[in-house]
Amino acid sequence: MNNSRTTSLPRLPDYSRSATITAALGTAVLIGGVALGLYSRFLAAANPVTPGDDARAELPDALGMSAIVVGVVALLIIAAVLLSARRLRAAGFGNPGMTIYLVLAAAIVRTMQLHVPSVAEQIFEHYAAFPQLPTALAAWVLVCLGILVISYPLTAVPRFTPTARTIAVPATIGLLLCALATGGALWVGDDDRFTDHRTAASVVAPQIPNRLGQERFRIALPKESTVVVGGPGFIIGTPTGITAYDGATGSARWHYLRPDAAEDGVHHEESNLLSIPSENTVLTSWNHLGWIAFDATTGEKLWTESEFADDSRSAMRVASGFGASSEPMLALVDDELFGGSYGNFARYDARTGRHMWSEPATPDGCDNMKSRIAITSLAVYQVRVCRNELSAWTTVLALDPATGAETAKRDLPNPDPDRAPKVSVQEDALSVDWAYRNAPLDHLVVSAPGLLGTAPVAADYVKVIANDPATGTLVTNSWSTGITLSQGGASDRSLTDPDAGLGGVSPFDSKLLTDELIAVGDAQLRTWRRADLVENTPPVPLGSGQASQIIAAPGIILIPFDDKSAGLQLIGFAP
């Protein structure tokens, strides 16, 4: 009997047409999901700010990387089935396609681990739209969908006998599905959908009026609003954004608004609105979005905080004065108080965000912790407390705003080196107050850096009412001298208020113009001739309400006025 007859493995049936189509479709979707995951993880723009919550901060990166890893593992399983399924089954290893269920289980566990639905919803609700998260979500959905679609053809039968047509058509459909998902994700991540941005033509800004003049317009202001100088007029900030106005006419020129701004989401922090007229720039601070800089004349967007994510500015604060409608420069410090700052001062170009220079190091013998910085339009002042074995002194340095180079220096004996003087900015003038009554030093006020060496040290506290740095003209008030106007720091050219009519003037409700000194009190405006401090009569009534600020802008003098019947208004005056 001849037993040499060979027996072969039973022939397995071919894939059905539907299984072949499903396999091609699932593979194409997987490939598209991995490609979109790579884009999300390495190319897509991330959240402009880093959320404080770890889950929110990590989700976009983690989800994109998960889509890449899980998708690649699934594609490797498909390749293993195509290349060696019959050989592995013949060796007793079973169907390798069954491992796709392990990948599917891992995807489910990863989704639960990252809390994808809830965390993604929180990010969409509280932060500005950005491409990385929606593309990561789309990639993850495509990968999971591809695994589900491919699981049946992988586990049912291990042999393929497809035709070119049965692969090309479903693969094309799968890639089109990926393209639609990508387009939808990019649309969801486009933050421009939520903004209303209108620009204006460039014009030459008019001069600040030389005197008060007459009332020209009234603009209703929201309860939560801030007014700053900017471009050829002024800019009003509200929680929804900013609108720039022409100073001469009071008409709107350009705006940048988020009409759907939410209190717990992205909204404009109007109290932080910062104008830098010397660089024709206005900076806006947005909750959960960061700083955005605009050209104050045209409204063109110049830069955003996210462009500088690699430096330390996001952890620092913009140095600004107290109650000011404009600031002289963009500078970042560790801490700030009423325009006086201490520690790690850095000067930036407001139009580009480029770092220009940093505070010079404190020399030996000077206490770095007691060093103070004050920012004015003409200089950055560094006030140091120094000592050696024989004496103690205070050094005041004037630094050039553009380069940081020293332009003036003054050393003054310090009666108590263990106490640092109070350094602040009053009406764009440097104020150094030692607060040592009956001591050699009391109060130094410097209206311009060129007067640092000659500015007198007062015997008592001096309150600056108004200042013109260009001419070194100061209007001050003190117990010993009363209201005084001094020019260039020279006492022989000082004028004392002849009728004591300025007693109610404070630094927050007065402005020194070319020809007049203006003061506001409650519901009326008073003016004095700058030449001799003689009051013009009669006072200008504003209505029934209260005003406490004067803003001198190009082409207009502005008075925010809280009218008892009409609400908050902005009143414009011009000659």
Question: What is each of the regions a protein language model found here?
Answer:
Residues 59-62, 98-157:
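Membrane-embedded alpha-helical segments of integral membrane proteins
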Residues 1-106:
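Membrane-anchoring hydrophobic segments
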Residues 159-193:
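Internal/C-terminal transmembrane anchor helices
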Residues 216-231, 259-278, 307-330, 361-378, ...:
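Repeated scaffold domains used in trafficking and secretory/extracellular systems
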Residues 230-231, 238-240, 278-279, 287-289, ...:
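Short loop/turn segments that connect beta-strands within the blades of beta-propeller domains
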Residues 16, 51-66, 123-140, 209-223:
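Membrane-interface segments at the starts/ends of alpha-helical transmembrane spans
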Residues 53-55, 157-160, 196-220, 243-259, ...:
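Surface-exposed loop/turn elements that mediate protein-protein interactions on large endomembrane-trafficking
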Residues 235, 283-284, 338, 379-381, ...:
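Structural core positions within WD40/WD-like beta-propeller blades
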